[in-house]
């Protein structure tokens, strides 16, 4: 799989790194909020300028704070410097602080690939402030305002020439979203899959705030894996940033083909897990229930089967969904998980012709004793991925649930065993004679 040249955005918190990242991408990808240390993970995205592409990476703020998360963020930034082709050092043109000087010193040995970006040059009369930064020793400098989009086009054109590559196509065969409560093992899994620590792993719940993308190849097919901030109950969302992360996690479900719903095997199933399951099925996405941290379980005979029965009782809406157990540390169940994802993707893309459907429908009707006042006319599949059917009847009021479920169960047997299928009842208008 071809790889893109990489551009890393670095700087202390609140200099506008994420706003610049979004402007260069021309989208709202990183969370931007006037709160210290909003971006924590490495947020990667392929940037397209004309027909040229490169990978743009937003980072957490370089800070002198000594708390655990701040130290992890700084270490992640420093470990990324060797691996990239260009470094955009973002400074606030209005002030330079101790943290700015600290990161400048760390960047000295990479000066040949450092581009100085002076942000918050919101008006022309601020351009004179740039002269105060010439003594920092970096040859290339851009004056921008990420908020007002000043200087962004010039910077994008520069990046296109310096690192942009044409005609690179990474066809993605399967998009997978890793969803679950905070600290359920999502970031550990995606770090293992990517081979890099792009997502912060900590014992503190809620350390991932953006969604993190990575690509990998399995059996000649390209997976795009998206990790999200943990979904928590809205009543407990106290910060604006956490609110955005919850909404972004729900948007990720909309973006992907298949969801891995990660559940910490040591935690109880919750109503929030159930709400996630309902949202996924309502959207017609494939879903695999994944119990993580299986290495922590002292397994007794029949424990996994009992656990699966409990899940099916707790999640009746997911009685079709596969259930897996994994341990990243012990390398348990990971290959099987991807094989199952291939299987689900095939089912999502399977489409049955209308004539074949109606032949089977006639057989199902004969095998079922239905109230004579409700008559099925015909059925058609209107889409794949999500799989949607429309079932036409002479009337839909008081349509028996038992018969509806009977039809859905029969539809599953023809090639949709492990995925949600959406069946809409419609009333067939009587032909006028």
From Swiss-Prot:
Keyword Oxidoreductase (UniProt): no
Residues of the KH-like domain: 350-429
Pfam families cross-referenced by the UniProt entry: KH_dom-like, MMR_HSR1
Annotated residues for binding of GTP 2: 180-187, 227-231, 292-295
Keywords assigned: GTP-binding, Nucleotide-binding, Repeat, Ribosome biogenesis
Domain EngA-type G residue range list: 5-167, 174-349
Residue positions binding GTP 1: 11-18, 58-62, 119-122
Listed GO MF terms: GTP binding
GO biological process terms on file: ribosome biogenesis
Disulfide cross-links: none
Residues forming coiled coils: none
Cited InterPro entries: G_ENGA (IPR031166), GTP-bd (IPR006073), GTPase_Der (IPR016484), KH_dom-like (IPR032859), KH_dom-like_a/b (IPR015946), P-loop_NTPase (IPR027417), Small_GTP-bd (IPR005225)
Subunit note: Associates with the 50S ribosomal subunit.
Record-stated family: Belongs to the TRAFAC class TrmE-Era-EngA-EngB-Septin-like GTPase superfamily. EngA (Der) GTPase family.
Function: GTPase that plays an essential role in the late steps of ribosome biogenesis.
Protein name: GTPase Der
Organism: Borreliella afzelii (strain PKo)
């Amino acid at each position: 799989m071809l790889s893109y040249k990489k551009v890393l955005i670095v700087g202390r918190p609140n200099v506008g790194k994420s706003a610049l990242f979004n402007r260069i991408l021309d989208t709202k990808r990183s969370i931007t909020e006037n709160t210290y240390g909003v971006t924590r993970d490495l947020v990667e995205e392929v940037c397209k300028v004309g027909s040229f592409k490169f990978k743009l990476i937003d980072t957490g703020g370089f800070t002198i704070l000594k708390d655990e998360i701040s130290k992890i963020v700084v270490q992640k930034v420093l470990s990324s410097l060797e691996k990239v082709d260009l470094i955009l050092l973002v400074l606030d043109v209005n002030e330079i602080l101790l943290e700015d000087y600290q990161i400048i010193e760390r960047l000295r040995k990479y000066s040949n690939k450092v581009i100085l970006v002076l942000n918050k040059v919101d008006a022309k009369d601020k351009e004179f402030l740039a002269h105060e930064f010439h003594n920092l020793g970096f040859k290339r400098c851009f004056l921008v305002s990420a908020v007002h989009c000043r200087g962004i086009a010039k910077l994008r054109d520069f990046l296109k020439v310096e690192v942009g590559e044409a005609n690179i196509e990474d066809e993605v065969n399967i998009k997978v979203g890793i969803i679950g409560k905070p600290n359920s093992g999502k970031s550990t899994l995606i770090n293992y899959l990517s081979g890099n620590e792009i997502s912060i792993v900590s014992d503190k719940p809620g350390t991932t705030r953006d969604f993190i993308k990575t690509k990998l190849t399995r059996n000649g097919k390209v997976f795009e894996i998206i990790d999200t901030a943990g979904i928590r109950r809205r009543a407990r969302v106290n910060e604006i940033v956490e609110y955005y992360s919850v909404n972004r996690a729900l948007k990720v479900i909309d973006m992907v083909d298949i969801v891995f719903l990660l559940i910490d095997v040591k935690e109880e199933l919750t109503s929030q897990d159930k709400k996630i399951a309902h949202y996924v099925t309502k959207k017609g996405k494939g879903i695999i229930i994944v119990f993580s941290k299986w290495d922590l379980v002292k397994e007794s005979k029949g424990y996994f089967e009992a656990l699966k029965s409990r899940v099916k009782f707790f999640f009746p809406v997911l009685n079709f969904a596969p259930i897996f157990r994994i341990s990243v540390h012990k390398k348990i169940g990971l290959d099987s998980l991807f094989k199952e994802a291939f299987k689900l993707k095939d089912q999502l893309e399977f489409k049955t012709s209308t004539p074949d459907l109606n032949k089977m429908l006639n057989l199902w009707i004969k095998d079922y004793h239905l109230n004579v006042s409700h008559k099925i006319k015909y059925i058609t599949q209107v889409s794949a991925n999500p799989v949607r059917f429309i079932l036409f009847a002479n009337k839909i009021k008081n349509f028996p649930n038992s018969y509806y479920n009977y039809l859905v169960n029969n539809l599953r047997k023809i090639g949709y065993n492990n995925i949600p299928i959406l069946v809409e009842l419609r009333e067939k208008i009587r032909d006028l004679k």
